[in-house]
């Protein structure tokens, strides 16, 4: 189960990330995949990964369904995802879900940067990033006809 990058904006500053349009990442390890998984129920997640081999890009990626479900619970309670080097060791990200008009998760968006910026979720910078990501995802969802629950 993968996510596919459909769009990407890059800053003028240097950031070493290998993501580009068309990149495919394991949903359980990418921040965008994780926000979508966080909106599914446990049975849906179990069925999605039944008989699937989990190949994490880094050592901290989930290695089994129990780890995915544990991560899903935390992500679901938050309503957004922080990722600290799960795909690329020195890259962190914050992601939020995009919903369609029926409230079904159809995608996500994230902001990525140096892992150090994302490690402390309570830092001023991290809070600004989180709020911007949540607002952008809300606007994208509303553009698709979604109305907040």
Pin down the residues of each PLM region.
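Amphipathic alpha-helical effector-binding/dimerization core
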Residues: 1-51
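Short clusters of small/polar residues that mark proteolytic maturation junctions
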Residues: 8-10, 86, 110
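Residues at secondary-structure transition points
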Residues: 23, 27, 63, 124-127
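Short, basic/aromatic recognition patches
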Residues: 49-96, 138, 142-145
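Juxtadomain coupling helices with adjacent low-complexity linkers
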Residues: 89-90, 107-149
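Sensor-regulatory modules in signal-transduction proteins
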Residues: 98-101
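Helix-turn-helix DNA-binding module
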Residues: 104
